[in-house]
């Protein structure tokens, strides 16, 4: 019979393989988009959320690594963009930062309470074909504000820039 230790090693190895596959998958998608759009890549960094950090044995659910000097991205919403940050390596935060702004309301509450008119108006100035009833749960109004997040993360990251979208795509299931 398989020992407990062998099962744990199998799970760990499987998770490591899946996480490596995800890294390669993101790199492949980026390469296809860059080539298809005729862009030149200037800089790249990767921020992963919802994974196991085997080096520190930290399960990051809704969180990303924020090791000392590590560049990371914290998405806010589809209108306001994302924060580019550098980690402070704060052990009180498990060397982590939030993966995003966090919801003000559940997906079902957003579908119930938010209006299409308000959603459409909030996306003025950003090219998108994704604003619809099917994506209203992702409306900017469903998330905490950028200011609230900026104020909450000072112990774990230094904010170095804010990037604002000019194009947004959100698949509707």
Task: Describe every region a protein language model picked out.
Residues 90-93, 97-126:
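Catalytic phosphate/nucleotide-handling subdomain of diverse soluble enzymes
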Residues 8, 42-60, 139-145, 164-173:
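A glycine-rich phosphate-binding loop feature that marks nucleotide/adenosyl-phosphate handling sites
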Residues 123-173:
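Long, Lys/Arg- and hydrophobic-enriched amphipathic alpha-helices
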Residues 53-55, 81-83, 92-93, 104-106, ...:
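Flexible loop/turn segments at secondary-structure boundaries
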Residues 12-88:
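Accessory "access/gating" subregions that flank catalytic or transport cores
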Residues 20, 24, 28, 92, ...:
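Conserved active-site and cofactor/substrate-binding residues in soluble primary-metabolism enzymes
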Residues 15-23, 109, 135-139:
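Hydrophobic alpha-helical scaffolding
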Residues 1-11:
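Single conserved hydrophobic/aromatic residue that forms the stacking wall/gate
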């Amino acid at each position: 019979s398989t020992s407990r230790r062998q099962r744990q090693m199998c799970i760990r190895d499987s998770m490591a393989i899946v996480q490596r596959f995800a890294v390669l998958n993101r790199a492949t998608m980026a390469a296809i988009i860059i080539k298809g759009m005729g862009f030149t890549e200037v800089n790249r960094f990767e921020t992963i959320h919802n994974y196991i950090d085997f080096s520190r044995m930290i399960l990051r659910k809704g969180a990303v690594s924020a090791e000392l000097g590590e560049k990371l991205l914290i998405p806010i919403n589809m209108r306001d963009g994302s924060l580019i940050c550098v980690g402070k390596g704060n052990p009180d935060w498990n060397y982590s930062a939030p993966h995003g702004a966090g919801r003000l309301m559940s997906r079902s509450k957003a579908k119930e309470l938010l209006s299409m008119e308000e959603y459409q108006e909030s996306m003025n100035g950003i090219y998108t074909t994704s604003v619809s009833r099917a994506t209203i749960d992702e409306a900017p109004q469903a998330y905490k504000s950028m200011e609230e997040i900026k104020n909450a993360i000072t112990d774990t990251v230094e904010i170095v820039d804010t990037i604002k979208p000019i194009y947004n795509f959100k698949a509707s299931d």
